[in-house]
Regions:
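Glycine/proline-enriched, intrinsically flexible loops and inter-domain linkers
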Residues: 1-191
């Protein structure tokens, strides 16, 4: 009922409220108070493979792409705050130097889980801070489960783990009600 834009454009838009905000007047280059209706936008995406290979810039560009989409929603929105989440494999082998895991993790093309958590968190925060969007909350999951498959005679060990990391980036923004939708362009229109 309150959804204005969903599953099209670069981000979703939901119904907001009238409020006073300070906006830049593009003609005078001065900030002016504006009493208008502002709606909320939300965008989320993952940047898993780049973050697994090179955590700091992988997470940085994940946040950057999501911020770009928030800014380009409709005829242009503003960013407010972000969230970041990480799901990685077992971090105990790094923390306690458990040798039985080292050969396995050294053969992966991804970084070790603890390295991903630290460097990806730094990268996501770095990009948001540089552009003026704080990451105000997030989540972290580290999981490895070892089970015995009792469905066969061999009682095979089964391991369940995040071998490929998940890097989640989400953010809220605001957009003027009159900017919810892009205009249709014709050939020769000036942008």
């Amino acid at each position: 009922k309150n959804v204005i834009v969903a599953f099209k454009d670069n981000a979703s838009i939901i119904e907001g409220e009238y409020c006073v905000d300070i906006l830049l007047n593009n003609f005078t280059n001065q900030f002016i108070p504006v009493n208008d209706k502002f709606n909320f936008s939300y965008k989320a995406e993952t940047h898993n493979f780049p973050t697994g290979i090179c955590p700091f810039p992988g997470a940085e560009t994940g946040v950057g792409g999501r911020i770009r989409d928030t800014l380009s929603c409709g005829k242009g929105g503003d960013i407010i705050a972000g969230t970041a989440g990480y799901c990685v494999g077992d971090i105990l082998h790094d923390l306690y130097q458990i040798n039985q895991y080292n050969d396995y993790y050294n053969n992966l093309i991804h970084n070790k889980p603890l390295t991903i958590l630290i460097e990806a968190s730094n990268g996501a925060s770095d990009y948001g801070n540089k552009i003026g969007e704080p990451i105000i909350q997030g989540f972290c999951r580290s999981y490895r489960g070892d089970f015995i498959d009792c469905n066969n005679d061999k009682n095979t060990n089964i391991r369940i783990e995040y071998l490929k990391p998940i890097m989640f980036s989400g953010g809220i923004g605001k957009i003027l009600n009159k900017n919810n939708y892009k205009k249709n362009l014709n050939y020769g229109d000036l942008l």
